[in-house]
Every structure is written in C-alpha cells, then in structure tokens.
C-alpha cells in the first residue's frame, strides 16, 4: 500500500486523473492525502469535487481557503469573484450532497505511523501538533453545526492577526481559519501577514516564512497553498513538504509518496 500526498487541485481535473494514472493509483490498496483547495480557478472544479468524494475512505482531505470560499457562497451568500469557477457546483443537481460532504472535512490530518501532519497552509511554530489539532476541531465543530451560515458569514477578515489563548468567539475561530488556510509569512510573535503572496523575496520587514521557525516537535508537515514556492522550502528549520506547484497557473500537479519519498509530477495540460 502506498500513501500519496497531492498538491492543490483547484479544479484541474484532467491533470488529477492523469496523475492518478501515472502513479497507478488503486483505491482498494492505496490512499490519497489532498492538501485542500480542491476547487476554484481551474475549469473542472465540479468534476474534482465529485471525483474526490467518490474515493470515500481512500482519500483524506483538508480544507483550503478556496474550499471555505465555496462553502461561504453556499451557506452565507458570499459573492463570487470574476475569476471564480464555482458556479457549476452551486448549480449542480448534487450540490447539497457535495457541499455537505465538503463541510465535514477537517482542517488537519495527522498520522503518527507516517510521521506526518497535513494542513492546507502549514503549521505555525507556536502550536504543538496536539494544540493545532484541538484548534482545528473548534472550527470543524462550527462548520458541521446548525449555525454554519452564521459562522461562514463572519469568517472573513484579517483581524485579529495574532493568536492568543485568550481569544474567544468568532475572533478566535477566524485566527484559526486564517492560520490553517492563509498563512505564509509570520512574525516571531506569531502575527500573520496577509499581503505578501509571492516568493520568499517578498517577505515584509519583520516577517519570515512559517517553516523557518524552529519547533519543539518535528513532524513532517505536508502543505499546499503557496504556489510561488514551487515545492521548495529554503531555510526551513522543520520538515516542511510543499506540494502546491501551481498546476492551475500552468505549472504542474505533484504527488509525493509519503512512504518512499518519491515525487511524481503531471505537467499542466494548458497554461492559464
């Protein structure tokens, strides 16, 4: 049995299917980890969502910022942007089934046998794996609860930008969401930067990539989100495995065998 971690799909369904063929994926034998952002920007968002859901227990998924945007559009009426490719999902006959499945996916997956933790954007140095799992569970309960629409309507925002244990209510949940799904550069005190989205040379003064801070524990951290890294984490002081290689932007879709350490790459089928 192999376990493959795959980067951001973002609606690149043709490349996803080709990558599964490339690795000879067998759902009765193998397992997939998907780092989130299954949907948006690419042309096959609906097909990606259906395909991953159909894999059942063979696939483990964490939510990304684009997945949460889809849920906010569905439950809280969040407006779609011109670049969004989410309308086919919202208009699909099976939308309710797909969206209910999506909102029940976690923000963090942990497997001690594989010595790996997966989140969409990474793992901040000031949270242990246990603390991160506890914080993820707080948001997961909100997403699965009856007041999911109220939560999603209040989820957006950049404030507060720094975690403290004293945070309560929506402020607490918003920082957790932003940490798991939007984090790139952070300050030594844990403050998140939301402006810089390019490579490492775009770091604001006083900020550094989250993976350049040492941790007390040292799990393998599987993440996506940051396409500008192109799979590299220079200066890392943790075992960070970057898997978003920008398929939706004309790059590639990448799979990592978490057992053998072998990478498999499917080039984008079209530049966008």
Curated annotation (Swiss-Prot):
Which enzyme type, at the first EC level?
Answer: hydrolase
Pfam families named among the record's database cross-references: Metallophos
Keyword Hydrolase on this protein? Answer: yes
InterPro entries cross-referenced by the UniProt entry = ApaH, Calcineurin-like_PHP_ApaH, Metallo-depent_PP-like
From the Swiss-Prot or TrEMBL record, give the protein name.
Bis(5'-nucleosyl)-tetraphosphatase, symmetrical
UniProt keyword annotations, A-Z: Hydrolase
The record ties this protein, via NCBIfam families, to: apaH, PRK00166.1
Keyword field contains Hydrolase: yes
- Enumerate the HAMAP family for this protein: ApaH (MF_00199)
Query: Catalytic activity annotated for this protein?
Result: P(1),P(4)-bis(5'-adenosyl) tetraphosphate + H2O = 2 ADP + 2 H(+)
Biological role stated in the UniProt entry: Hydrolyzes diadenosine 5',5'''-P1,P4-tetraphosphate to yield ADP.
The EC number(s) this enzyme carries: 3.6.1.41
Q: Of which family is this protein a member?
A: Belongs to the Ap4A hydrolase family.
């Amino acid at each position: 049995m192999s376990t493959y971690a795959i980067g951001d799909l973002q609606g690149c369904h043709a490349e996803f299917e080709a990558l599964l063929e490339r690795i000879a994926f067998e759902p009765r034998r193998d397992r997939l980890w998907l780092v989130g952002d299954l949907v948006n920007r690419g042309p096959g968002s609906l097909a990606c969502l259906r395909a991953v859901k159909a894999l059942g227990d063979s696939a483990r998924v964490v939510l990304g910022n684009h997945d949460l945007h889809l849920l906010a559009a569905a439950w809280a009426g969040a407006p779609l942007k011109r670049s969004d490719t989410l309308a086919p999902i919202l208009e699909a006959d099976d939308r309710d089934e797909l969206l209910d499945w999506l909102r029940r996916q976690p923000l963090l997956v942990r497997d001690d046998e594989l010595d790996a933790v997966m989140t969409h954007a990474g793992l901040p140095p000031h949270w242990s794996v246990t603390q991160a799992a506890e914080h993820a569970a707080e948001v997961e309960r909100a997403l699965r609860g009856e007041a999911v629409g109220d939560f999603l309507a209040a989820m957006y925002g950049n404030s507060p930008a720094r975690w403290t244990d004293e945070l309560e209510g929506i402020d607490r949940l918003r920082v957790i969401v932003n940490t798991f799904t939007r984090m790139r550069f952070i300050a030594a005190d844990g403050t998140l930067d939301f402006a810089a989205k390019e490579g490492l040379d775009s770091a604001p003064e006083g900020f550094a990539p989250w993976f350049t801070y040492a941790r007390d524990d040292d799990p393998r951290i599987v993440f996506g989100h940051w396409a500008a890294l192109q799979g590299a984490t220079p200066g890392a002081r943790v075992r960070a495995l970057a898997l978003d290689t920008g398929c939706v932007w004309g790059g590639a879709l990448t799979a990592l065998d978490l057992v053998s350490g072998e990478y498999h790459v499917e080039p984008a089928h079209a530049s966008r």
